[in-house]
A protein has these predicted regions:
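Core segments of cupin and vicinal oxygen chelate
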Residues: 11-57
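Vicinal oxygen chelate
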Residues: 17-18, 26-27, 54-56, 76-116, ...
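Membrane-helix exit/interface motif
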Residues: 62-65
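Acidic/histidine-enriched, glycine/proline-rich intrinsically disordered or flexible terminal extensions
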Residues: 136-161
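A short, polar/charged loop-to-alpha-helix boundary motif
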Residues: 71, 124-138
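Short loop/turn microsegments at loop-to-beta-strand junctions
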Residues: 8, 47-48, 104-106
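Short, solvent-exposed beta-strand edge segments and adjacent coil->beta transition regions
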Residues: 4-8, 74-78
Length: 161
């Protein structure tokens, strides 16, 4: 018998899950599957569950208010966006930073809602784990200087062009 287990990411927002769901659906060309207002919850009258589908993954966002034991998001958990080319890197990088996100290093950023993302070109393993040790070292040094990853510069460092 086949296991049909499915994993859904569940994200707790203090008060803007609906807004965040719309933002992520627009960035990833996804869709909102459901938006349910919950009644009589300890979190108060503005508690919503919003389920969205992004790139064949399901996410449920809750507008749960401030609750003991639930903290803001941190970089300890991140979502990786695998990009086929630099054009996709540029698109996701600028889209996820829109409205107050903060860039970090090595392709990492935090969006305006506090979620951390890694925007990574598919070609990265070719240069960071390639057979040429000196090339790998140069590619790593080039990457460590970057916020948004530039695959051409990383390739050039690897190839020593």
């Amino acid at each position: 018998m086949m296991n049909s287990m499915k994993i859904t990411s569940f994200l707790w927002f203090v008060d803007n899950a609906d807004e965040a769901a719309k933002f992520y659906a627009s960035v990833f060309k996804g869709k909102i599957i459901s938006n349910t207002k919950l009644k009589d919850t300890p979190s108060g009258p503005n508690t919503y569950l919003v389920t969205i589908k992004l790139a064949n993954m399901t996410f449920t966002l809750i507008n749960g208010g401030k609750a003991k034991g639930f903290t803001q998001f941190s970089a300890a958990t991140s979502f990786v966006v695998n990009c086929k080319d630099q054009k996709e890197v540029n698109y996701y990088w600028s889209s996820l930073l829109k409205g107050g996100g903060k860039p970090s290093r090595c392709g990492w950023l935090t969006d305006k809602y506090g979620l951390t993302w890694q925007v990574i070109p598919d070609q990265m393993p070719k240069y960071l784990a390639g057979s040429n040790k000196q090339g790998r070292d140069r590619a790593m040094k080039a990457m460590l200087k970057m916020a948004k990853l530039d695959i051409d510069k990383i390739r050039q460092a690897y190839m020593e062009e």
